[in-house]
């Protein structure tokens, strides 16, 4: 294997691929990245056995072939090379080394056998569809904050992506919950997604997928089976894009519809950004363990307060739109902030029942994104 490539293209491809590699590995080859040179393209492949990322970049290939090298070291070397450098990479099979040269810099990295590098098994996907990157970005960004980090409830450790019925017909829906808060986000159902099996996309995969979605003009091809989900950038078919394949969580997502309140009568309308900032301010004195903040609602008036015996107290009043009975209700400040930060519109609408029942929040009159948060005693 021998090729030369622009440093910027190499760094972009290696950065994306190596991000799935775990720093500590009991299987040595999983710490490596596979470089494969063929035609006028270099393919970079990395895996942790649950996620596989393949990135591609154009290069001048003098000799086809492949080798595996430490993902972390290779990435660090390329990152530290000067901007605009032309990087020459060459494998010496006899020595078991790969050399990296740019200008007056030269490095050698040890290799492990290419044939030992694991490949994710091929899959027959039940549904394949194309979706604009901004649509997928919205689905994941507005739901992933609610993913559970409790490993014993593994079936909550991801975003549940599925086809659902809404008042406007069938939609592509993303749901996440940790038992304390829930996010449900809808998007128009793409053509080809009708037979999509409901799958739970793991937290780490969501983080890696999100890196593919920053280009507003990009289209992403999504393929789903009962056990795997694949995301490919539009240019992947042309040999220069990224393909990410992940196993999905083998579990049953709970019946989330049961916890979404349907008829909470008390309505609060508040400036979302102002509300989030106020919660942040009063929570400064809350205890680290509970982070409790009390909402006291009266006619067109909201008082946020914290009373922490060990550290102090805080109170802030906001002008709001509220015309129902008085209500005092407590929440975890972090949960309120994270939900309020999802609001793209100016106003957030909270629907309450009483101090012990779940509260519903939505963005203005937009029904495509709703959030549920459980109260706590204060």
Feature names for model-found ranges:
Residues 1-378:
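Structural preference for solvent-exposed beta-strand-turn elements
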